[in-house]
């Protein structure tokens, strides 16, 4: 199973497009093309070894905000100070997400209150004793801790490399201590 952190793939596609075009508002057709092409490329590269793609999305509401209202507050402040048209960006990403869900054969997971990270972590734990391999498609280093499961590997679309070389338990301990 290939667990795709779709928020990272989607936002990276938009940011690359805006950077290359020097625009602040995305071209929906180009962003759609970039996202679909990325998914096609990863499917072709990894499906024989890992199986089907499962697109994992963040919910609009995070349960962590119920307990810590400042959760990811700096991202919001960063968007407010950005020249990019974030309303247009989110409109394009939501349109592409709806199209992927309605017209494409990929499994689509979005759980109210959960982030894609939560979904991916839960699936890795559930699939630990499955005979298949699990690939996490994300550059988020927090996923290193999930490599404690014998069948989990991670590939970063950003660096275009497998993420490894760090002991998952040491990584988790270090980040707990750092806060």
Where would I find each of the regions flagged by the language model?
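Domain-level signal for Mg2+-assisted phosphodiester chemistry and nucleotide/NA-binding surfaces
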Residues: 1-98
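Extended two-metal-dependent nuclease catalytic cores across DNA- and RNA-processing enzymes
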Residues: 49-50, 77-179
């Amino acid at each position: 199973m290939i667990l795709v952190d779709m928020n990272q793939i989607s936002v990276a596609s938009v940011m690359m497009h805006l950077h290359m075009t020097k625009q602040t508002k995305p071209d929906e057709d180009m962003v759609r093309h970039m996202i679909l092409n990325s998914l096609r490329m990863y499917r072709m590269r990894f499906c024989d070894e890992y199986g089907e793609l499962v697109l994992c999305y963040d919910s609009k509401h995070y349960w962590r905000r119920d307990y810590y209202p400042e959760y990811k507050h700096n991202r919001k402040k960063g968007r407010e100070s950005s020249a990019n048209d974030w309303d247009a960006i989110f409109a394009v990403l939501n349109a592409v997400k709806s199209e992927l869900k309605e017209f494409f054969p990929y499994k689509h997971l979005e759980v109210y209150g959960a982030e894609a990270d939560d979904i991916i972590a839960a699936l890795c734990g559930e699939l630990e004793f499955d005979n298949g391999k699990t690939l996490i498609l994300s550059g988020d280093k927090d996923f290193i801790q999930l490599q404690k499961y014998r069948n989990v590997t991670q590939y970063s679309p950003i660096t275009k490399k497998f993420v490894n070389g760090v002991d998952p338990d040491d990584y988790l301990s270090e980040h707990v201590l750092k806060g």
